[in-house]
Structure formats: structure tokens, C-alpha cells
Regions:
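A structural "domain/chain start" motif
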Residues: 41-131, 241-242, 248-316
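Flexible, solvent-exposed loop segments that connect beta-strands
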Residues: 98-102, 170-184, 233-253
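N-terminal secretory signal peptides that target proteins for export/translocation
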Residues: 1-19
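Short beta-strand->alpha-helix linker/helix-N-cap micro-motif
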Residues: 123-147
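Surface-exposed short loop/turn segments
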Residues: 140, 144-224, 228-234
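Bacterial N-terminal signal peptides
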Residues: 21-37
Length: 316
């Protein structure tokens, strides 16, 4: 109901307030986006989740020490042997090293660590059998005086048969620290045969060969290769007022950077599992009494080699 007692000034004030309110409502709607951006009230787009890069490096290069079953007095047998760091060959390339073989470079690094541990344990094993052991040496780096001063050379060589399926693309993945990558998976099998040798040191002629077949194991592996962003073009973005700007657009391209790879870890785990078996077999095969019985045969081979015109490893 209209109040007849309202005075003139009060009526004018109410009229002015109504006009201001009607004008302010659309203005508020116009200003809201800007105010919301400034105050942080606009809904923010959630950042894409970033996956953690799996850690396959833990314990990669550590191998268990071999517990010696017994120990004789060092040097009590009266036989000097050269201890050689274990070597490997690949069935595909028939050569050692990672080049042109089925081992990745990181797998080859794992084997070198394994070989270092095994070389030290084999030397300790020989000493525990009462032998005088020198080494461990790399076979090609043994000097002539060391060869000449030894009765026998002890060598362990591992033949790997490594087979892969074709790696299949799984997905694109955004990783931590703003890294982008492509994830692949596949299967591989690793077969192992260990050969134990006794050599005459100077000629490197084989006195005997014994074998341990460790069979083959199958694995599922996964790796991710990194990608890098690059400027792929530009895109015009309107400012809503008849103008606008050109902004660069970006895309991803592949690189050779490996973000992670489970194969070296799987390889390391298999070597860890095989380690006690091959060391226990070495303890059995490298028998001090048998080696002592071969000393005269080794001397015969050395004399025959020394009288020949071809002297591999001897100074001219």
C-alpha cells in the first residue's frame, strides 16, 4: 500500500536508489569475469596428473658374497694360478660387450659389476683351497711375467642367449618434473650357460672345460622413452574486441632419452639368483688335487709352445 505520508525528499531518494540498483546489476555481470580472475574465484582447470618414474636402479649393481665352505692355509698346495675376471659372450654376436649384441648398455654395466664381484670371490675361493692366486685379471691384460710365473689359468665364461619380442607401444604418459614419454612393453627370455676353464697360461691352451647349464627364464619388461616439446606453428587468438594476437603452438617429438627401463633390473635379479649356484659349482670344479695333477701336463704344453715359431703373448 502506498504511504501517503512520505515527504518529497524521501520519494526522490527512493527513486534514485532504484535507478542505481537497476543500472548496477548488468554492470556487475559484465565485471564478474574480470573480478573473478583477479580474486581467483573462477574455477581453475585441474592440472593433468603426472606419473612417478619407476625406480629400477635399487640394488642393480650389488651381488652377494660367496660363503666359503672351508679354508686351507694359503699357499699350502704349492700351485700358482692366475684368476681371470669372468667374461661373457652372446649367442647372437658370439662376441662380448654390448655392441651388436642382445644386451643393452645398462645390462652390460650390470654384468661388469657382477663379473667384478665374481672375480674377487673366485680368487678368494682359490686361496681358500690352499693355492697361490694372482688376480683377478682381464685375460687380454695379463703380462708375460705373470703368465710365465703361473702354473695354470682359471677362467669362467658365461654364454647368454637373450631373445626379445618386438616392443609394443602402450601409451603416452606425463611424468613427474614435466617430462613426457612414450611407454612400451615386451617379453624377453634370458638363457645362461657357464663354462669353467683351466688354461696353460702362456699358450692359453685349454686343459679342461666343464659346464653348468642354468636354463632360461622369461620376463615381461617395460621401458619409456622421453619426448621433447617444440614449436609446431602458430594460432591466432582473438581478444574479443576486433583484434588479437598470434601465439606459438607446441607439439611433442621423440628422443632417444630413456626415462626408465626394467630390463637391467630383471637381468640383475637373474644374475643374483644364479650367483650362489655358479660359485658353488666353481668350488666343486676347481679342485686343488686335480689342478695339481695337471701341472706336469701344463709344463709339457708350455715347452711345446715355447719351441714353436708362433709364440702368442711372448715378447720378441
Amino acid at each position: 500500500m502506498r504511504n501517503e505520508n512520505e515527504t518529497g525528499p524521501l520519494k526522490k531518494f527512493k527513486k534514485a536508489s532504484l535507478i542505481i540498483f537497476v543500472a548496477a546489476v548488468p554492470l556487475a555481470f559484465l565485471l564478474f569475469p574480470s573480478l573473478a580472475v583477479l580474486t581467483g574465484c573462477m574455477p581453475q582447470q585441474a592440472a593433468a596428473p603426472q606419473a612417478q618414474i619407476p625406480d629400477f636402479n635399487s640394488g642393480l649393481y650389488s651381488f652377494p658374497k660367496f660363503e666359503l665352505p672351508a679354508a686351507k692355509k694359503p699357499g699350502s698346495v704349492g700351485l700358482t694360478v692366475l684368476s681371470i675376471v669372468p667374461e661373457y659372450k652372446d649367442t647372437r654376436s658370439e662376441t662380448g660387450g654390448a655392441a651388436n649384441s642382445s644386451m643393452t648398455k645398462d645390462m652390460a654395466k650390470v654384468f661388469r659389476s657382477f663379473a667384478g664381484s665374481a672375480g674377487e670371490d673366485i680368487e678368494a675361493l682359490l686361496v681358500a683351497k690352499g693355492l697361490t692366486a694372482k688376480g683377478p685379471f682381464v685375460l687380454d691384460e695379463v703380462t708375460f711375467p705373470d703368465k710365465k710365473g703361473a702354473d695354470l689359468t682359471v677362467l669362467m665364461q658365461i654364454i647368454f642367449d637373450i631373445q626379445y619380442s618386438d616392443a609394443k607401444f602402450l601409451r603416452d604418459e606425463a611424468f613427474e618434473n614435466n617430462q613426457q614419454g612414450k611407454v612400451y612393453s615386451g617379453t624377453m627370455s634370458i638363457g645362461m650357460k657357464v663354462y669353467y676353464y683351466l688354461l696353460e697360461p702362456l699358450s692359453e691352451e685349454k686343459m679342461w672345460i666343464k659346464k653348468l647349464d642354468l636354463g632360461s627364464q622369461d620376463y615381461n619388461y617395460e621401458f619409456a622413452k622421453g619426448q621433447e616439446s617444440y614449436v609446431s606453428g602458430q594460432q591466432f587468438v582473438s581478444d574479443g574486441c576486433g583484434g588479437g594476437h598470434n601465439y606459438p603452438t607446441y607439439a611433442w617429438r621423440d628422443t632417444n632419452k630413456m626415462l626408465y627401463d626394467s630390463r637391467p633390473k630383471l637381468f640383475s635379479d637373474q644374475l643374483k639368483d644364479a650367483y650362489p649356484k655358479l660359485m658353488k659349482t666353481a668350488w666343486t670344479y676347481f679342485d686343488a688335487d686335480e689342478m695339481l695333477s695337471l701341472r706336469d701336463k701344463a709344463k709339457e704344453i708350455r715347452d711345446r709352445w715355447g719351441s714353436s715359431s708362433y709364440r702368442r703373448g711372448a715378447p720378441q
